[in-house]
């Protein structure tokens, strides 16, 4: 009986001393003018964001989430400064349909030192609900920062790197953070397209 009580107290003591991990933060991107750097395009908990998500100081605590109604467009991470964005994960949950089969949301890049880094939260591409939303997603320069899952729902697409529909004049690559081998598990009935030369 004594050893059991001793280890119970020890476990409680260690849990008490363990540093508290800050909660993940969901940044909702509205995409009205398609610029990451415009804080008017971001909200946190329904209020305006004070900074764009995924800075190095808050590495892998932020999620990029769409709001399902106003996120169609194209944005450039290249103006964010060297190092890029550190995201826990990305959830594309329904976007305005775009004519002529264009990718509703494409994160392009014009700066070779800037990457979109995605950690264990991975990438999810799916419709927010029934109806006229088309939740396709493309990303130019992606660094996989942990083992993760990419879930692409039936009828949806995830484009990584250069593709016929990708914007011209951008940089395209798919790499692993620190060149460490990573495992990416792909689920769902949708399509994942990796560009040429990846």
Residue ranges and their predicted role:
Residues 1-4:
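N-terminal secretory signal peptides that target proteins for export/translocation
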Residues 160, 194-196:
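Extended, compositionally simple hydrophobic/Ser/Thr-rich segments
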Residues 18-156, 161-180, 187:
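Solvent-exposed adhesion/ligand-recognition segments of exported proteins
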Residues 6-9, 31:
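Short helix-onset patch at the extreme N-terminus, typifying the N->h transition
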Residues 8-18:
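Bacterial N-terminal signal peptides
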Residues 169, 196-197:
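N-terminal leader/targeting segments and the first structural element of proteins
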């Amino acid at each position: 009986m004594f050893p059991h009580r001793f280890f119970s107290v020890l476990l409680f003591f260690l849990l008490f001393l363990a540093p508290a991990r800050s909660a993940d933060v969901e940044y909702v991107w509205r995409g009205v003018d398609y610029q990451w750097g415009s804080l008017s395009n971001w909200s946190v908990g329904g209020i305006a964001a004070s900074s764009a998500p995924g800075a190095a100081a808050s590495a892998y605590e932020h999620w990029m989430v769409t709001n399902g109604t106003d996120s169609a467009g194209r944005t450039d991470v290249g103006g964010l400064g060297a190092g890029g964005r550190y995201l826990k994960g990305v959830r594309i949950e329904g976007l305005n349909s775009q004519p002529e089969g264009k990718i509703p949301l494409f994160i392009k890049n014009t700066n070779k030192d800037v990457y979109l880094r995605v950690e264990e939260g991975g990438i999810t591409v799916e419709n927010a609900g029934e109806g006229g939303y088309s939740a396709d997603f493309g990303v130019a320069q992606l660094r996989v920062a942990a083992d993760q899952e990419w879930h692409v729902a039936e009828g949806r697409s995830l484009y990584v790197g250069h593709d016929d529909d990708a914007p011209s004049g951008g940089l395209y690559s798919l790499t692993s953070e620190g060149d460490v081998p990573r495992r990416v598990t792909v689920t769902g009935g949708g399509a994942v397209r990796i560009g040429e030369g990846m």
